[in-house]
């Protein structure tokens, strides 16, 4: 049903957004109404991290039903989604060894478009999206797109410092940049936990997870962050940390008796991304993910204290 909304309602609007901005393909909107209008915001139109969602969701549909019917249903918009991604990356290319991603506000929204660049989640999701879009071309009997392969190869590596992945690189000299990195969404962990990992050092990510757990300003986080952290910890083989993340004692990790994920009293008394993140994390911790070596409950400690019962889950990408 969600992809039908993308296909039937949002795609014409997304095509116009890309065209208006001088890009090919479809630029999916971040904050929208049921009719795919862009919601008023000083942030939403500068976000990129929603762009590969269509590719991720289409891949989920193919995994559930790997058929020609599925390919024909979604291949066109997978292609056009990737066309924008490639065109945007080309606009960022300055001819160096690596292609940076610039001019966008990060999922970690305190990392603004004019403050930082090379945000880790966006870099990882861009690489994932273009890689999967190439698979779709091959499934459709097409040759790989050489431009996309060049971008995949040359996308900048995740920024790091002292063996810890960073929230981005400063656009200009900023004395308090490091302090700024420990607020808002811990998006750097999403680069490993939310999507299949590509070219990320698990040891460095483990150090990054430890730095987040000990230094983050939790009052600035949001309800879906805790599930994201748990999924990262699970992929790293840290089930105790995964549970700790789900149970972080902070206001925005509050669930009311009616199930709503309460955020603040003045706004967002319910927050469905928090519910979605919690449910996704629990399912992933039970069923695992592609390449996971443990057949059952990899996200829970093997200390004899957990007796899990579940059914109907599929492994996460």
Predicted regions and their residues:
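Acidic/His metal-coordination segments adjacent to aromatic residues that form catalytic metal sites
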Residues: 28-46, 101-119, 254-268
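Short, solvent-exposed loop/turn and secondary-structure capping segments
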Residues: 1-2, 17-18, 88-91
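Acidic/histidine-rich catalytic neighborhood
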Residues: 80-139
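A glycine-biased, small/acidic residue-tolerant capping/turn segment at secondary-structure junctions
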Residues: 93-103, 291-302
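Surface beta-strand/loop "capping" patches
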Residues: 296-317
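Active-site-adjacent "gating/activation" loops or surface patches in catalytic cores
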Residues: 9-52
